[in-house]
Amino acid sequence: MKRILPLGLLFAFLPAAHADLAAGKRKAEACAACHGADGNPATGQFPVLAGQTARYLYLQLKDFKEGRRSEPTMAPFVAKLSTQDMLDLAEYFAAQKPRPFAFKADAARVARGKKKAEEVLCTMCHLGGFSGQNEIPRVAGQHPEYVIKQLKAFKARTRTNDAGSMTSVAQTITEQDIEDLAHYISSLE
């Protein structure tokens, strides 16, 4: 009990971080050219941020800022972000609705992708429906081009900010599996 009380007092004096959605919306204007004003990009070159878990978004912004995740396009945007900026942006994009985009999934690829997802146990982390949780991203409805890009980056170990889980899984999948998984994941809502 003597140890718990001082620890409790310490936490009582720490400032609580609260996200400001209105501030997040204003800050997101700098993101709109690539990610869309509401986190729904016009092209598969960039990820859908709308509806993504706030914790995941915050951690990715932090990783970009601190150099644990590399993407030259992101570097100038994250360089001057404060912790509060990142919290505001994460909560703003998490609160937005992902919109469907034009994508004609190949039924055979979707079936093969679903089978591969079951084999490598994707839903153990990404949950059923690939909705994500906390620091695990929502990947359902993500653009297939972006899914392919990220799976290839994990496989090539050029993206390693995942504590090793995706990097390990990616070593077990083929190029065909990557294409099939992208069709399956992109077909989900």
Predicted features along the sequence, with ranges:
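Sec-dependent N-terminal signal peptides
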Residues: 4-13
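N-terminal signal peptide c-region/cleavage motif recognized by signal peptidases
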Residues: 13-14, 19
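Sequence/structural segment immediately N-terminal to covalent heme-attachment motifs in c-type
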Residues: 20-38, 101, 105-128, 143
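Protein kinase-like catalytic domain
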Residues: 35, 65, 126, 155, ...
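Gly/Gly-Pro-rich "capping" loops immediately C-terminal to redox-active cysteine motifs
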Residues: 39-69, 75-81, 114, 118, ...
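C-terminal capping alpha-helices of c-type cytochrome domains
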Residues: 79-101, 145, 150, 171-189
